[in-house]
Each structure stands twice: as structure tokens, then as C-alpha cells.
Amino acid sequence: MDHIRNFSIIAHIDHGKSTLADRIIQVCGGLADREMEAQVLDSMDIERERGITIKAQTAALSYRARDGKVYNLNLIDTPGHVDFSYEVSRSLSACEGALLVVDASQGVEAQTVANCYTAIELGVEVVPVLNKIDLPAANPENAIEEIEDVIGIDATDATRCSAKTGLGVEDVLESLIAKVPPPKGDPAAPLQALIIDSWFDNYVGVVMLVRIVNGTLRPKDKIKLMATGAQYPVEHIGVFTPKSRNLETLSAGQVGFIIAGIKELTAAKVGDTVTHATKAAVEPLPGFKEVKPQVFAGLYPVEANQYDALRESLEKLKLNDASLQYEPEVSQALGFGFRCGFLGLLHMEIVQERLEREFDMDLITTAPTVVYEVMMSDGAIIKVENPAKMPEPPRIEEIREPIVTVNLYMPQDYVGSVITLCEQKRGSQINMQYHGRQVQLTYEIPMAEIVLDFFDRLKSVSRGYASMDYEFKEYRAADVVKVDMLINGDKVDALSVIVHRSQSQYRGREVAAKMREIIPRQMYDVAIQATIGAHIIARENIKALRKNVLAKCYGGDISRKKKLLEKQKAGKKRMKQVGSVEIPQEAFLAILRVEDK
């Protein structure tokens, strides 16, 4: 076991994590040169395209070090984005070491810090690496200073490399072997294996990626998953080199896969412990928690007959993404669809994009909302994730909204505009620190404000230099109200939003004005109203189209004209009683684009 090293790579988006992984695999000869391709561990198209890693992947590599010994290196590739922070913490707890990759031209950024703190908390040895030193803009001294200043680990002897050209990659591996301790664990103890990730394979069912902490596993063993208590016979075990290779045993310290004919991905939860059914471990490995969605949105098919196809697509996506939750929902305006729960905004975008791209769905998405806690006047507490389900104001004692702690990092030139943005979003400043040219701001901001467009606006006010990560803090009582939109006195449920009272008037007026531009004129007057409970806060009218019924009257008696006008008026009135206003697709999207003032 002294020759095993389990490590992962942590970095901010675009600092070259996947490229470095490619180089390491190449140096260790994991794949022949002709099989090598860019971002070899990112298997989804969308991962390659956006340049982000979503699912964890592994590669078991052997490397002959300069001291002549052969080491087994297990590389566990982790996602870098905040939405997937739980997956990151599981991947890190399977390692003894982590390469902290920092772009020498950009320095430390938010997600680097967030994931690095997670690693330090889990007791993982962090090895700093400066990447992209071949760039003319690279400033390694500055980056080293930032690592020491912001994260507080010694980086004087940080290895310098360029993953793109392959320069210095062997030095990275040497310092990894020198600094990272070998895994501890007892091959003879009862089996304990941590599930790092799991996905669905069409041929063999669920594939579980595990790190064996104690014990030994062989094919035909009967295993038990501790969170659910379910038991399965093991069919295959092995490692990825990144290609899969079956083995006869997996023992303590190794990272590999288990295939046990599991049909449901929800059975193999990330972070759960696998043990033997007969000689079971006494307690599971620490750190397991059920992942709860933070952001909800309604997904509806554009064509009503696509509902079944959408359900199937969601089922297939759920096979590979256990954190996605959905339940059927009916909206009077949009018909049948699903209410989906996501880990965060990036997760939501990815799910939408995969539905559109891999399953050819045309979707309408309602405005994303967060989960509110509502205390009723009779003392009961309910959770509301859909504005349409919010109880009437008289029955509500108080509404509590989720507050998140946001860490922002940016060059000092942009501090002013970022602070202004946070103040607009009802944020309260907790902390502000200067690290050289970089500034770290900590704010508490209501999650609802972050969900809509905070990230985009942050990028635009800081010209793309600011980076952020956030974590849930608590529920706090807030003065929020539900704004409903009425069209000709009928409530349109899909347009309801929950906003802070201070913004409700403005929001109601803006949405009503947008609707007025978008809804086509009808044969009768259409009234668009925004209401809070029974109180109307904004109104817009769409004037009727009318035919000139007097065109054929030349001169003659006024009563003749009056009769025609009265007849037209009566017809319009009758029409208004039976007619329903078709709300075009754009109206629902318009709601998402109403800017806060």
C-alpha cells in the first residue's frame, strides 16, 4: 500500500484542470497516443463544450518515479462548480492529497478557495501547482503570494508547469509522490467502501465508483448499501485506466468500480458506504447526506402531446443525475408539465440544455424560485417551492426566505460596482479583506435574489473578473409577497412570482407593461392587472381592434349609425364573456427578463 497515491485536482473553471489530467494520463501511459483526445475524462458533450467537469471520473495509473519505484496513482477528477460542491467533498474525502491548480496569469479565484477549504477541512494534503507558466501574462510570484495570503498554505516550492505543452508535468508527479501520504486502511477488516459517484450504463445497470477504505472485495461477494440497506451480488469489479479493466480483487486504499446489477441510480447514493452483507461494518463512513434541491422551476413541453416524451427524458436524465428531482404539475396556462428541483442555477441550465440537445425537447421554463418556509396563523410550518401554492395572505403569520453566504473575489478596481450590486440585491456585508490586488467580500444575500440573474450581472459589472461561490446559511423572516397577474380577471398561475414587498410595485408594473407589448390585440379590451392578494398594484389595458361599421353609411339619420355601433358594442361584450386570451410563449420568458431596479 505504500506505493498507492490517491489524489484529485482542484481548480477554478478554466485554470486547466482537465488539461493537466490529460497530460498526467499521457505521461503515465494510461492511453495510447492515438486514443488521446482533449479532456479525456469529460465524457459528456456538454462538459467538453462548456469546458466544465460535471461528473467525477477516475483513472488508475502506474508511474515509474525517478527513484526507480513504480507507484499506483489514482486520479479522481472532481467537478469545480459550486452547484456540485457535495460531489466535490465526496471525491476529496476519497483522497489523501489534492493538486491545487492555479492559473499563473490569473491567481486565486473563488471556487479554488471554496474547494481548497473543503479539502483542508477533510484533512487532505494540498499540493500547490502553478499552471500556464508558458503564457506571456504569467506572473508566478504574484500567484504564489496570493495562495499564501488567501488560502494560507506554504507555496514557496510550488511546482510550475504548463499542462498544454507538457512542461513540468513530471515534476508535478514527483512532488505529489513526495508530499502526499499513502492511504491507511486494513485489507483484513470488514469492508467499507465510499461511493464517490455512480452512473447508469445501458448494458450493465448502475456503475458505482468507489474508494475502498477498509477490507477487500471480490466478484460474487454479496454487498449491502448502508443508507438503504439493500443487498446485491457483485458481478464485476475493476479500475478505469481511463478505459475499464476488470480485476479479481479490490482492496483497501484502491479506487475502482463495482457493478452489481442495480437498476435504480437512487439506490446508489453518492457518499454512501458499501459493505459486505454477511460480515458487515459496524458503522458507515462519515459525511453522507441527502442532497436537497435549492432551486425549483416548472418545465413544460411546448407541444402538449410531448408530455410523455418529456417524462421519459427526465427519467433517463435522472438515471445519471440523482440530484435532479421532479414531480408532475398542472398549470392552467401551460398545461401538463413537471416541477423540477435543481442544486443551483448551473445545474438547471445543464439539465435544460441536455433535455433540448440529447432528447430534442422544446421546453418552456417558468421563473426559477427557491423554497420558502411559511408559518401559518395556526402555528403549522409548510415549505412552499411553487408561487402558485402560496397560501392566501390572511392565513400567513410570517414567511421566511433562505439566506446564503456569498464569497466574492475580485480585483480591487471593481469593488465599488460589486458592492452596489450586492446592496441592490438586499445583501448585508459581513466581511471585506484585501489580499494584495485581490479583494474578498463576504455578503449575506437572500437566495431568491441570486437565483434570477445575480451571476450574469456580477460578471458584467466586473468585466468577468469577479468570481463567487455561495452556501446556504439559514431561513430568516422576510417581508415577501406573492404578485399574481390577472388577465381579464383570470389568474395566470405560471406568471405568479414571490418578491420582496419593496420591489413588488415596480415588478408588477414592469411585468404588466411587458405583457401589454407581447399579448396580441383582441377583438375586445383586455385588462392586465398585477395584484397582491385582493389589492391591485398595477394595470395596463390592451385596446380592442375594431372594424369601422359606419363605413357604408353616407349621410342619413344618426339613429342608423347609433344602432350599428350599439350592435357592435353588444357583440364585443358577448365575445369578451366567452373569449379567452391566448398568451404567447414569449410572455413567460419576458417574466424572467424583468430587471430589478
Swiss-Prot record:
Membrane topology note: Peripheral membrane protein
GO BP term (any one): positive regulation of translation
EC number: 3.6.5.n1
A Gene Ontology term for the protein's cellular component: plasma membrane
Group of enzyme by EC: hydrolase
Cross-referenced Pfam families: EFG_C, GTP_EFTU, GTP_EFTU_D2, LepA_C
PROSITE patterns: G_TR_1, G_TR_2
Compartments, as annotated in UniProt: Cell inner membrane
Gene Ontology MF annotations: GTP binding; GTPase activity; guanosine tetraphosphate binding; ribosome binding; translation elongation factor activity
Domain tr-type G: 2-184
Keywords: Cell inner membrane, Cell membrane, GTP-binding, Hydrolase, Membrane, Nucleotide-binding, Protein biosynthesis
InterPro entries with a match to the protein in the record: EF-4, EFG_III/V, EFG_V-like, EFTu-like_2, G_TR_CS, LepA_C_sf, LepA_CTD, LepA_IV
PANTHER family hit by this protein: TRANSLATION FACTOR GUF1 HOMOLOG, CHLOROPLASTIC, TRANSLATION FACTOR GUF1-RELATED
Similarity section: Belongs to the TRAFAC class translation factor GTPase superfamily. Classic translation factor GTPase family. LepA subfamily.
Name of the featured protein: Elongation factor 4
Organism (species): Burkholderia lata (strain ATCC 17760 / DSM 23089 / LMG 22485 / NCIMB 9086 / R18194 / 383)
Designated gene of the protein: lepA
